[in-house]
Amino acid sequence: MRLTAKQITWLKVALHLAAFLPLVWLFYAASQGLFRADPAKDIQHFTGRMALKLLLATLLVTPLTRLLKQPLLIRTRRLLGLWCFAWATLHLVSYSLLELGLSNLSLLGSELVSRPYLTLGIVSWLILLALALTSFQAAQRKLGRRWQTLHNFIYLVAILAPIHYLWSVKILSPQPVLYALGAIVLLAWRYKKLRQWWRT
């Protein structure tokens, strides 16, 4: 049985809550001192992992739509993508404010150059910014065929973001590896499309 438009609306509400409630918990945990000895790092990692989870969830929508034969599921993709951008922005802000500090924000440029994993992160964020700004129907109509070409860059983010995470951790743990494997599986599912996109 196919999902109805009303059921999709309730699903979207649930997804909004699933993406928002971790932010409530983050503020609570930070205010109550629930993080470990290095709360700045913990907050950065938490926001980064949330962005990655939502990135993978965004990429999962199309396979689920086709495998489950639920065409209306595609309506959830944009909200997941926008939440991914929101959490990626929180990740960038947490690094800028908690790692560098307001007085040292001028060092951000040199940090991006001297630390390649940060370069991958900022490139990913800039792509997500472009996708978020053009995610609305008005932008889609204005860009025409170029809209799809632009939004295919989400696949580049799916490559760069897991590498950014793997590269940033000092001690390799299963978590970043699992995110990378998830991205590989979702990209492999799109092998033909990726090959065509790469050739254009």
Curated annotation (Swiss-Prot):
<keyword id="KW-0479">Metal-binding</keyword>
<dbReference type="InterPro" id="IPR013130">
    <property type="entry name" value="Fe3_Rdtase_TM_dom"/>
</dbReference>
<keyword id="KW-0408">Iron</keyword>
<keyword id="KW-0997">Cell inner membrane</keyword>
<dbReference type="GO" id="GO:0010181">
    <property type="term" value="F:FMN binding"/>
</dbReference>
<keyword id="KW-0288">FMN</keyword>
<comment type="function">
    <text>Part of the MsrPQ system that repairs oxidized periplasmic proteins containing methionine sulfoxide residues (Met-O), using respiratory chain electrons. Thus protects these proteins from oxidative-stress damage caused by reactive species of oxygen and chlorine generated by the host defense mechanisms. MsrPQ is essential for the maintenance of envelope integrity under bleach stress, rescuing a wide series of structurally unrelated periplasmic proteins from methionine oxidation.</text>
</comment>
<comment type="similarity">
    <text>Belongs to the MsrQ family.</text>
</comment>
<feature type="transmembrane region" description="Helical">
    <location>
        <begin position="153"/>
        <end position="173"/>
    </location>
</feature>
<dbReference type="GO" id="GO:0009055">
    <property type="term" value="F:electron transfer activity"/>
</dbReference>
<feature type="transmembrane region" description="Helical">
    <location>
        <begin position="54"/>
        <end position="74"/>
    </location>
</feature>
<dbReference type="GO" id="GO:0020037">
    <property type="term" value="F:heme binding"/>
</dbReference>
<keyword id="KW-0349">Heme</keyword>
<keyword id="KW-0812">Transmembrane</keyword>
<keyword id="KW-0285">Flavoprotein</keyword>
<keyword id="KW-0813">Transport</keyword>
<feature type="transmembrane region" description="Helical">
    <location>
        <begin position="116"/>
        <end position="136"/>
    </location>
</feature>
<dbReference type="GO" id="GO:0016679">
    <property type="term" value="F:oxidoreductase activity, acting on diphenols and related substances as donors"/>
</dbReference>
<protein>
    <recommendedName>
        <fullName>Protein-methionine-sulfoxide reductase heme-binding subunit MsrQ</fullName>
    </recommendedName>
</protein>
<dbReference type="GO" id="GO:0005886">
    <property type="term" value="C:plasma membrane"/>
</dbReference>
<keyword id="KW-1133">Transmembrane helix</keyword>
<comment type="subunit">
    <text>Heterodimer of a catalytic subunit (MsrP) and a heme-binding subunit (MsrQ).</text>
</comment>
<dbReference type="Pfam" id="PF01794">
    <property type="entry name" value="Ferric_reduct"/>
</dbReference>
<keyword id="KW-1003">Cell membrane</keyword>
<dbReference type="GO" id="GO:0030091">
    <property type="term" value="P:protein repair"/>
</dbReference>
<dbReference type="GO" id="GO:0046872">
    <property type="term" value="F:metal ion binding"/>
</dbReference>
<keyword id="KW-0249">Electron transport</keyword>
<feature type="transmembrane region" description="Helical">
    <location>
        <begin position="8"/>
        <end position="28"/>
    </location>
</feature>
<dbReference type="InterPro" id="IPR022837">
    <property type="entry name" value="MsrQ-like"/>
</dbReference>
<feature type="transmembrane region" description="Helical">
    <location>
        <begin position="79"/>
        <end position="99"/>
    </location>
</feature>
<keyword id="KW-0472">Membrane</keyword>
